[in-house]
């Protein structure tokens, strides 16, 4: 049995506690400084998590932020970061107050992200490592989880397959073995870049696949589109995988990772009706991004759109329309706030 501390009481952090519990680990969730009222409400409602619509088992210990120092000062084998990408600076600050290079436990990130730093692409795992090194912690072992695993499904223990990635294959294997259950099926990989890049950019491509219904034909009725758009969706998925392979290799990942759980698997789930696919469907119908955001998804975070805005300048410097026709069309539709138009002749 190992002691695991999950930082963040959101949907995925809380759901992730289930396979940890079922492996007989000492599992603890500690909220961020922004989640105190949420945790009070959660406990008042008998551990019914509103983001999961299911109860968190009582055996999973849930603490408010005030307990973070006490929890992390104990014998912790694995710290799981279930915070938003915007909370990475905060997390690095908290960890640097408690640990040094000699005693920091292994870290596992549930959060995905890609940004631009000094005109270079920077994955969220790399950003965390950079921030910790800036604070004097140089020996850091960070793993990440990739693959098609929605939080509500995991919380209800439905069969789910994921990949644990770490640059050191032995560490990836060990953590995968720690978490594997009869419903949470874990594999392992040393292609941390490939897994993380796939996980981030699939949000852009799931918008493109989500647009299939509107894009399938200009000459048929909405009723016909509704029944016959899957041909188009399949073509867009195939092109998405082709372009994801190019981009993953550009960021020093392995192209074969794209056809695994972190790429194709996650794209399939995300294209099935998540926030990115919803935004794509509105854009496919002919709305611009700003129109869709204002009228349909005003208060909803669309990760693919946020990423498109973040990397637009850099990706247009690095690639042309002939190389990444679908990705650039989607990104430029978002950032230039224009209707989505695809050049099918450029597809492979």
How should each PLM-predicted stretch be described?
Residues 9, 82-84, 272:
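Glycine-rich, N-terminal phosphate-binding loop of Rossmann-like dinucleotide-binding domains
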Residues 109, 140-146, 186-190, 259, ...:
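General beta-strand structural signal in soluble alpha/beta enzymes
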């Amino acid at each position: 049995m190992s002691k695991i501390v999950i930082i963040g009481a959101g949907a995925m952090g809380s759901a992730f506690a289930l396979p940890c519990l079922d492996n007989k680990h000492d599992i603890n969730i500690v909220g961020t400084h922004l989640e105190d009222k949420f945790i009070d409400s959660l406990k008042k409602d008998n551990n019914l998590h509103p983001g999961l619509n299911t109860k968190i088992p009582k055996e999973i210990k849930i603490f408010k932020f005030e307990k973070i120092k006490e929890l992390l000062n104990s014998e912790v084998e694995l710290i799981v970061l279930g915070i938003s990408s915007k909370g990475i600076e905060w997390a690095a600050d908290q960890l640097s107050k408690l640990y040094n290079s000699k005693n920091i436990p292994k870290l596992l990130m549930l959060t995905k992200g890609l940004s631009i730093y000094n005109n270079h692409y920077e994955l969220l795992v790399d950003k965390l490592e950079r921030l910790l090194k800036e604070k004097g912690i140089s020996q850091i072992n960070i793993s990440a989880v990739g693959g098609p695993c929605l939080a509500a499904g995991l919380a209800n223990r439905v069969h789910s397959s994921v990949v644990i990635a770490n640059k050191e294959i032995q560490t990836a294997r060990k953590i995968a073995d720690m978490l594997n259950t009869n419903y949470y099926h874990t594999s392992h990989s040393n292609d941390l870049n490939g897994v993380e890049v796939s996980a981030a950019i699939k949000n852009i491509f799931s918008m493109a696949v989500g647009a299939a219904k509107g894009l399938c034909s200009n000459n048929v009725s909405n009723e016909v589109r509704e029944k016959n758009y899957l041909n188009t969706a399949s073509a867009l998925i195939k092109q998405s995988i082709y372009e994801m392979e190019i981009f993953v290799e550009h960021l020093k990942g392995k192209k074969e990772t794209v056809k695994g759980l972190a790429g194709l698997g996650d794209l399939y789930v995300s294209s099935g009706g998540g926030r990115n696919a919803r935004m794509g469907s509105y854009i496919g119908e002919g709305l611009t991004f700003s129109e869709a955001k204002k009228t349909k998804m005003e208060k909803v975070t669309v990760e693919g759109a946020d990423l498109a805005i973040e990397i637009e300048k850099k990706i247009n410097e690095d690639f042309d329309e002939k190389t990444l026709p679908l990705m650039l069309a989607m990104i430029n539709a978002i950032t230039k706030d224009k209707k989505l138009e695809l050049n099918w002749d450029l597809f492979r």
